[in-house]
Structures are given as C-alpha cells and as structure tokens.
UniProtKB/Swiss-Prot annotation:
This is Ribosomal RNA large subunit methyltransferase K/L. PROSITE patterns: THUMP (PS51165), UPF0020 (PS01261). Its main location: cytoplasm. It is an enzyme of class 2 (transferase). Specifically methylates the guanine in position 2445 (m2G2445) and the guanine in position 2069 (m7G2069) of 23S rRNA. Gene3D superfamilies: 3.30.2130.30, RNA methyltransferase domain (HRMD) like, Vaccinia Virus protein VP39. It comes from the Bacteria. The lineage of its organism: Bacteria, Pseudomonadati, Pseudomonadota, Gammaproteobacteria, Alteromonadales.
C-alpha cells in the first residue's frame, strides 16, 4: 500500500473526503487543505484519473524528524533516489514550508536539488538534469516545524489541468473549483432526472458547463491529460494504467451515448464563446453542449426547470464597480421573472454583489478562486421569493428628474457642461451627484455614526440602481467615488489605473477633469462664481493663487488679461495639471507655477513681490510631510491671512475661501490686524449648489 496526500483548495476538504470515499479506499483521513489516503497502485491510478476536486496527488516517499540543516541534508542525500527515477530523466523540486535554517523556498528547492544530484553521483550514476518547464519527474518537499516530508508529485502537474483549456478568459475559474461549485449546487440531483438541464449564462471560456458535461457523461477529468508524473517512476505499471485508461474511455463512450439532457452556455462576448467551443472540442463534448452569444440579463430559460450555475464578472477594477453592480441587479430581475422552478448557484467576489440580486438564498459557501476569496450562493426558485419593495425609489427618482429638468436648462444658458444635479436632497440618500457632459459622478458622503454601515451601503447601491432611470446616462458612464479619510499624500495618489479624462467648459474656459484616478476630479464646481469674479475683474492686475490645486482660478485670471499670474501649491501632480489647463486655453504670458509650502514661500517672498489680488483657498486640514507643520483652517486662518497681507498691494484684496462646514471667521482678530472683512458667501454659491448652503465660505478682505 502507498500513502498519499491528496491536496485541495481550502474549504473543499469535506467535499474531497466524500469524493474519496467513493473509491473504496481502506483509509481516508481529512486534514487541512486535503486528505491522507492509503491505496494500492490500481486505486492510486483510479484516483488520479477520476478525482474532480483534488488539486495535487503526492506519493509520500519518506519523512523524518529533523532539528538542523545538516540533518535535512543527510536525510535527503542518504535516500535512494535512483529507486524513484533514472538518472537520464529530468526533474524539478517544489519546496514549501521552512524553518530557522530555510527561510526562502527558492533556497530550499536548491538545497533539495543538490542533495538529489549528490545521491545519484555517490551511487555511481550520471547527474540528472533540471527542467523547470516540462520535467519528467516532480519532487515535492515540505519542512514544517521539525518534520521533513518528501514526495513524488504523482500527477506531475496541477490536477485542475484537464487538457481542454489551452485558452482562457480574463478571470479564469479553476476546473477543480468549478467541479466543487457544481457539487455544492446539487448537480447530482439534477443528473438523476430523465432529462437534466444545466445552463451557464456567463459561460466565458466554458469551464463550468464543460465540467458539468464531463460529470453528466461520465467523462473522467484525467482522460484528456497528456502528461502524468508517474510515467517515469520506477514502480509505474503500464498495464495497470492502461486498464484504468481503457475503462475511463469506455465509460465516457457509454455516458455520452446515454445522456438525454440539455447543456447550454452563453456569454455576451463572441470571442470567449469561440474559446469555449474550442475547449469543448478538445474533450469531444462540442456536439453535446450548445453555446451561443447572448446577454445574461435578457436570456430565455432553455427549459421549464433545471440548474443554472454561473460566475458573473466581479468588477474588481474601480471603473467597473457601478456597471457590475447594475449588471447583478438586472440579472436578479431576469432570474426572478424567467427562471421560476429553477435551482440557481451564483459565484461572486463580494457579498454586496449577491445582495443586488434581491433573491433570498438558502445556503452560502465561502470559497477561494486561487487566492481570491469568493462566495457561492444557492437559490431555490421553485419556492416563492420575497418581494423587495422598490417604491422607495420613487421619491429619489422624481427628485433627481426634477432637478435635472430645471438645472440642465440653466447650465445650457450659462455655457456649462459640468454641474451638480443632486446634493443629499433626501437625507437617506447621502451623496452628491455631478454631471460631467455625458458622465455622472456619484460622491458618497460619510454616513452619520448612528447609521449602520450595511444600511448606508444598501442606500448607496439603491441610489446607483435608480440613476439610469432618473438621468439620461448609460450605465457604463456612472462613476462612484467613496469618501475615506485622507492622510499624508493619499489625496494626491491615483485611486485607479483606468483613466476617464474629459475637457469641460466653464464660462468660456476649458478645464481638464479626471473622473476616476483621484479622489477629486480636478475642478471644485462650487467655486465657479469665484472664478468668474476673477475673470471679470483681473485685467492688467497681478494675481497670486495660493493652494492653487489644478490652477483653474489662475486660468480665469489669465483669461481676463492679468498682467501676471503666480500659482503656488505643494503638489507637483496638480501643478502639472494646471499647466495643462493653461495649454488647453492657449494662454501664454507671465505665468509661474511654483511647487512650495505656501506658508514658507510667503515668508520668503514677503516684501519682494506684491499682488493686486490674492486668491486664498486652503484645505480645511493638512498634515502633509512637505509642510513645516499642520494646518487647521479654523485655528490658523488669521495668521494665514495676515501672512498673505504682507504680499498685498496697498489697495489690493484677498479672496479668502474654505470648505469647513462650521467655520467661523475671526473678524475681531482680523480687525486688530487692520483688515476689513466682507462676507460674500451667499453671493458666491452657484445655482446648482444652493441646496447645500454650507458648501463653502467666501470673504473679500482688504485693508481698513
């Protein structure tokens, strides 16, 4: 009898144990990430051929208690490797685990390789060669605590490699996981019917439906594999293996002939459907699986009842989040409307996505797709599903529609193609919705502390689901930004690698906005009228823009014909952005872009440069490493304004703004400094922000 460790993905140990019981083995013991078995050679070949859930099959060659590196070397060098394989065969070593002496698996693999080579040489044989790509023999060695185990990888490669998937989609589903999903979904019950029906409406490259077909037609998962790790093992029995192989071929022939059901896969990507057909052809299943190009959210049920199993897109990338969310919602409606009397299994990367189906599951299983945590949910549509009321959408949809009808006319008249259509008008839906040409950007506000996170999430998702019916926007142009507290340089870092960059128009100016890569888009729309004031009043003036961000205020001052415009900001990213904004407007003149801490720069330039207009729009709070200290605008605004006054011409003005909600300007402190404050907040708030009166504070400050 031989001792094997049959490995599987974590979470599948129980299923693997049940499967191994079917092989009439005398000993099966379940453990973490697999099972130990004892088997004779014919049983071992049978497990290798027929296990659908195992990922590897390791024949244990030896194990030993070791306490040092020397003891590891001694055990592996003294083992008779020439009894396992010939010196003229190539091999490779897979090493896992480690201890105080072996901290890196690469070092461990090299150590084992040297021991094997030394053993062959010491036994009078030639040195065997290494082949990492296509070895004849694969040796697996593990060190865990003080235990050393060495094994022959019996199958030679991952058992998920069935031989049919030479090509795959962007997010491949491992064949072993696909088989486990089908078992969890209840495929055995479906196959007991006279005419079973199995359907995957998101089939991709066909893995789930091909695995289902292999089960339905008694096609062994190992039948189409080209290479096995035991073929060059000294104890391999070609006759026994031939018998197992011949039996598998005969069972498939009979199973295919006797199958009377319907297997179908569809996908909206023609390229992937073509791959799926090719994959099915490699295992001779192309004639029994129907593939078609179709939209899963608008597909017909292929029969009155059956088993639907699918792995819809996860939408891992930021730009895909909303589109994926809405896809699940539409798919959930389609299931409820069209697949009554069906059993459903959906694999998703996120519990929130499963919630969007609006179906009640009777069972959920956490699984791993490679290293990615996923969730499998089962739904029984043969039983009545609850109605999830959607009447609450009416108030939100009506409000957004009403706002859009009113404000779109106003925006067209003003020459604007970016504006705010909704700003937490209904408190339960706590977000801002901005129009950027034909895109919609949803910015979530932080929920009150007394609102549970799950409730806030549900409300946000519900808002997103309602947008496509409330606004003239396609779902792939809805972008979600989720607010998180920013620290250090996070606010300057890219949030996504998939850019959506537009050029928008504001009172004749062109500005670059980036809807996806950063927390903000590059344009603070609530300051639109302040920028217009600069456009109207800065001709022939010297203008300083502090905390300049993407220099949109500087652009309007320059367009007004300002004699000089200086923009100062700590962020190189934003200043480069500002330079692009100037280039978009074909502005050439005395324009400077200075990367510096505004406090330090003003102290250095005090008395050297004077300006007619200083636009001062600092952040509410900042603790950037580039700053000499922290900035709290409530605490520090008097000192900041007094410092700026040192660069102000005698009859100049400071345009001071900030976005702190409960900001209170210290008129007494500024009065003592000889400064006069004119509160222009209400006049500076544009039409589309009037519902949010605390969006910013704006003051014109001059010498008394």
């Amino acid at each position: 009898m031989y001792r094997f460790f049959i490995a599987c993905s974590k979470g599948l140990e129980g299923l693997l144990f049940d499967e191994l019981q079917e092989f009439n083995l005398s000993h099966v013991k379940q453990t973490l990430a697999g099972c130990y078995i004892e088997a004779d050679l014919q049983q071992a070949y049978t497990v290798a051929m027929w296990s659908r859930l195992a990922s590897r099959m390791l024949l244990q060659l030896g194990e030993k208690e070791v306490s040092s590196l020397d003891e590891i070397k001694l055990a592996l060098t003294q083992f008779s490797w020439s009894k396992v394989f010939d010196a003229n065969r190539t091999f490779v070593v897979d090493f896992s685990g480690g201890n105080d002496d072996i901290r890196h698996t690469q070092f461990g693999a090299q150590l084992v390789k040297d021991c094997i080579v030394d053993n062959f040489r010491n036994s009078g044989f030639e040195r065997p060669s290494i082949d990492k790509q296509d070895p004849d023999i694969r040796i697996a060695v593990r060190v865990h605590k003080d235990k050393l185990t060495w094994s022959l990888d019996f199958t030679g490669d991952g058992m998920h490699k069935r031989g049919y998937r030479l090509q795959q989609g962007e997010a491949p589903l491992r064949e072993t996981l696909a088989a486990a999903i089908l078992v969890r979904a209840g495929i055995k019950n479906e196959l007991e019917k006279d005419e079973p029906v199995i359907f995957d409406p998101f089939c991709g490259s066909g893995t789930l439906v091909i695995e289902a077909a292999m089960m339905a037609m008694d096609h062994a998962p190992g039948l189409s594999r080209a290479h096995w790790g035991f073929l060059f093992w000294h104890e391999h029995s070609p006759q026994l293996w031939h018998d197992v192989l011949e039996q598998a071929e005969q069972r498939f022939k009979e199973g295919k002939k006797n199958f009377k059901g319907h297997l179908k896969g569809s996908d909206n990507n023609p390229h992937l459907v073509a791959k799926a057909k090719d994959n099915a052809k490699r295992v001779l299943l192309h004639e029994v699986i129907e593939f078609e190009v179709a939209d899963a959210t608008n597909c017909e049920a292929p029969a009155e009842s059956g088993l639907l199993v699918c792995n819809p897109p996860y939408g891992e990338r930021l730009g895909e989040a909303v589109e994926t969310l809405l896809l699940y919602r539409r798919f959930g409606r389609q299931l409820k409307d069209t697949f009554q009397n069906w059993h459903i299994a959906v694999l998703a990367g996120d519990e929130q996505l499963l919630k969007r189906l609006k179906l009640r599951s009777h069972k959920k299983y956490p699984l791993l797709n490679g290293a990615i945590p996923v969730n499998l949910a089962l739904y029984d549509l043969t039983k009545e599903q609850p109605d999830f009321a959607e009447s609450q959408a009416d108030d939100l949809v009506n409000r957004v529609k009403k706002n859009h009808a009113k404000l779109s006319k106003w925006a067209n008249k003003e020459g604007l193609d970016c504006w705010r259509v909704y700003d937490a008008d209904i408190p339960e839906y706590n977000a801002a919705i901005d129009i950027y040409q034909d895109y919609v950007v949803v910015q979530e506000y932080a929920a009150p502390k007394d609102i549970p996170e799950g409730v806030a999430n549900d409300r946000l998702w519900f808002m997103l689901e309602s947008l496509s019916s409330a606004l003239p926007v396609s779902e792939d142009k809805i972008i979600l930004k989720r607010r998180q507290r920013q620290s250090g340089k996070q606010q300057y870092e890219r949030q996504s690698q998939d850019s959506t960059v537009l050029t928008v128009n504001e009172y004749g100016a062109k500005f670059e906005v980036n809807l996806t890569d950063y927390l903000d888009t590059g344009l603070f729309m609530d300051h639109r009228l302040v920028r217009k004031e600069l456009l109207d009043k800065c001709e022939e003036l010297d203008v300083l823009n502090l905390f300049a961000y993407t220099c949109t205020a500087s652009v309007q001052a320059a367009r007004a014909g300002a004699a000089r415009v200086v923009s100062v900001d700590m962020s190189k990213t934003y200043l480069k952005w500002g330079e692009r904004n100037f280039a978009l407007n074909r502005l050439r003149g005395d324009y400077q872009f200075i990367q510096a801490d505004c406090f330090i720069w003003m102290r250095e330039q005090r008395g050297k440069q004077l300006f007619d207009v200083i636009f001062l729009d600092p952040p509410t709070f900042s603790n950037s490493k580039r700053m000499s200290g922290t900035l709290d605008i409530q605490r520090d605004h008097v000192g900041l304004i007094k410092t700026a006054t040192g660069m102000l011409k005698e009859d100049g003005v400071i345009l001071f703004s900030n976005n702190r909600k409960k900001f209170r300007i210290d008129t007494e402190g500024l009065d003592k400094a000889g400064l006069e404050v004119n509160d222009q907040t209400q006049a500076s708030i544009p039409e589309d922000f009037k519902r949010h009166k605390g969006i910013h504070h704006y003051y014109i400050i001059s010498r008394a």
